[in-house]
From Swiss-Prot:
Keywords: Cytoplasm, Fatty acid biosynthesis, Fatty acid metabolism, Isomerase, Lipid biosynthesis, Lipid metabolism, Lyase. One of its GO terms (biological process) is unsaturated fatty acid biosynthetic process. CDD domains: FabA (cd01287). It comes from Shewanella denitrificans (strain OS217 / ATCC BAA-1090 / DSM 15013). GO terms for molecular function: (3R)-hydroxyacyl-[acyl-carrier-protein] dehydratase activity; trans-2-decenoyl-acyl-carrier-protein isomerase activity. Necessary for the introduction of cis unsaturation into fatty acids. Catalyzes the dehydration of (3R)-3-hydroxydecanoyl-ACP to E-(2)-decenoyl-ACP and then its isomerization to Z-(3)-decenoyl-ACP. Can catalyze the dehydratase reaction for beta-hydroxyacyl-ACPs with saturated chain lengths up to 16:0, being most active on intermediate chain length. Pathway: Lipid metabolism; fatty acid biosynthesis. It is found in: Cytoplasm. It catalyses: a (3R)-hydroxyacyl-[ACP] = a (2E)-enoyl-[ACP] + H2O; (3R)-hydroxydecanoyl-[ACP] = (2E)-decenoyl-[ACP] + H2O; (2E)-decenoyl-[ACP] = (3Z)-decenoyl-[ACP]. InterPro entries: FabA, FabA_FabZ, HotDog_dom_sf. Its EC number is 4.2.1.59, 5.3.3.14. Belongs to the thioester dehydratase family. FabA subfamily. This is 3-hydroxydecanoyl-[acyl-carrier-protein] dehydratase. Signal peptide: none annotated.
Length: 171
């Protein structure tokens, strides 16, 4: 059976509930912490390193929850939410490949913010290039990523690391 190469918001929510990739697969956050509305492309052999890529989007509108509290009178999307979205997508990628367990962000090499997401923006686009995949006792994905707002690159991150764990009680 061929794997899907794109996903809707409803499917991503189902992933957060353990219904899309399996009950024991890594889950996406749900509700306000899900920072992705759709995955428009995911594959195992594309991207800058030929090891996989993910292109995903988030629709922006002035009613998004974070604009009311970050900051009063000066609304801007928190940079950490864009970074978290990148980790979310690396974890999703590992689950899409068949990894089982709980996903956890393990680190990032370098992060640069060169712009901001304001309430009048229309769309954020995440572009992830998978650099390395480890499928042994430890399952881990490493990726480089960028985030664009309305076609302009504003964030970049190198060496985003996500691990998949069967037991997180001692993590």
């Amino acid at each position: 059976m061929e794997k899907a190469n794109s996903f809707t918001k409803e499917q991503l929510i189902a992933c957060g509930q353990g219904e899309l990739l399996g009950a024991n697969s890594p889950k996406l956050p749900i509700d306000n912490m899900l920072m992705v509305d759709r995955i428009v492309r995911i594959n195992e052999d594309g991207g800058a390193f030929g090891k996989g890529e993910i292109i995903a989007e988030l629709d922006i509108n002035p009613t998004l929850w974070f604009f009311d509290c970050h900051f009063k009178g000066d609304p801007v999307m928190p940079g950490c939410l864009g970074l978290d979205a990148m980790w979310q997508l690396v974890g999703f990628y590992l689950g899409w490949e068949g990894a089982q367990g709980k996903g956890r962000a393990l680190g990032v090499g370098e992060v640069k913010f060169t712009g901001q997401v304001l309430p009048d923006a229309k769309k954020v686009t995440y572009k992830l290039n998978i650099k390395r995949k480890i499928h042994r006792k430890l399952v881990m994905g490493i990726a480089d990523a960028t985030m664009e707002v309305d076609g302009r690159e504003i964030y970049s991150a190198t060496d985003l690391k996500v691990g998949i764990f069967s037991d997180t009680s001692t993590f």
